[in-house]
Amino acid sequence: RAQGLLQWVEVPFADVVTGKLARTTIAVSHRWFEKNHFDPEGQKIEKIQQVLRKEICDGVEFVWLDFLCLSQVWTDKGTFEKRSAEDEAFFQESLACMLPNLFLGARIMVLWDRDYNTKFWPNAEMYVSMQSPTAQGLLPSLNEHYRPVFACMLGFEGQDERIEKRMREDWQELHMDAAIAMLGQDDIKVTNKKDKEVNLEVLRQLPVNLQHY
């Protein structure tokens, strides 16, 4: 933000449900490598650049990455810096909006590694990215509307197709209630327990909100 590189984009919910957002925007789903930095050695940035050069990302104009697009309490040097009141309010508002808007409508770059599978945010993001919004609630996406782009890392480098197949089998066909129950288990870890509680409720309300749209 200090460099003036962030761009504020207001996204109508119509762009989420019609697929327009997916044509221009990709969001990165990942787990942080360290508590105070998402990518201390630059491995993820390199992987993101590789994926963006692929044909599957043609048309992408905007990339959303939490560390860069949400005000963090950790600087890019890994030091703690308290958010301003304004930044804290925006951060909390964003947490409640990400799943039912960004991750429901954009293309999703899944930076998968072994620990990704144990984290609440990545798994919730991946589940939502495999669904399509309908008047009946969330339904598994047909192939032509499927939005995840898998890019495996670390010990799973080069195993994109195998891991994607496995994750689709585990998550894509799950009914919302079953997904919420799985995400609510204690072995799905989250740094802030309140984040899990708030966003499980966000998922519960999604079908109702879609009916009202």
State the predicted function of each range.
Residues 1-213:
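The feature represents the membrane-entry module of six-transmembrane cation channels
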